[in-house]
Amino acid sequence: MTGAAASAAAPAPARSLLSVSGLDAWYGDAHILHGVSFGVPAGEVVTLLGRNGAGKTTALRAIMGLVRARGRIEFDGQSILGLAPFRIAGLGIAYCPEERGVFTSLTVGENLDLPPVVRAGGLSRRRILELFPNLAARLDHRGNELSGGEQQMLAMARILGTGAKFMLLDEPTEGLAPVVVQGIGATLRELKAEGFTILLVEQNLRFAATVSDRYYVLDHGRVAEMVPAAELAARRDRVQSYLAV
């Protein structure tokens, strides 16, 4: 199943917490997504795979109301397409962009304090630092004193105290050392065990395979493949072909 046929034929899984159907989206005047459909069941890690320019980031931005889009986007049974981004965030959806957005002039502790609480049930500071022990030792360091891996950890950590339980993570392993990537994978598995739902954008299939329950492969703005984790081994070469430059 490939191309436009997959876009139309890949239904969202039953009881999806997030359901995207027939989504078209634009980045400026460029028409990036064409009839994209996918679903994210509660408590799962779902990965959007694809090479640069496939439309993965645009899909996340469309969910957050940051780009022009049409189609259907529902969260917990409620239509969110057309809502202001702050209202979408208020539903418990948090977006961690690839550029991380760490405030470099603020300390780690100040960065952690900055995001507003949107819902009850956020993780305590103590639990957040248990998940990211590197940050515990650097609470008084400014953002510009952190390594790339530590900045990524901080960008993710800031979400956890807000009460958001649905995380959109854009390329969290991009440019990071293997040992840091392993640590991020371990943290995502812990968050999943604690009830978080995660939509992940990745090009790193080796990493995604350690955390994901299902994969949607985007190619030229369309869903080319939907692969449950149980089928990845048998279809890995085909999936990898969509990631080759």
Protein language model annotation of sequence segments:
Residues 2-5, 11-245:
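Glycine-rich phosphate-binding loops of nucleotide-dependent enzymes
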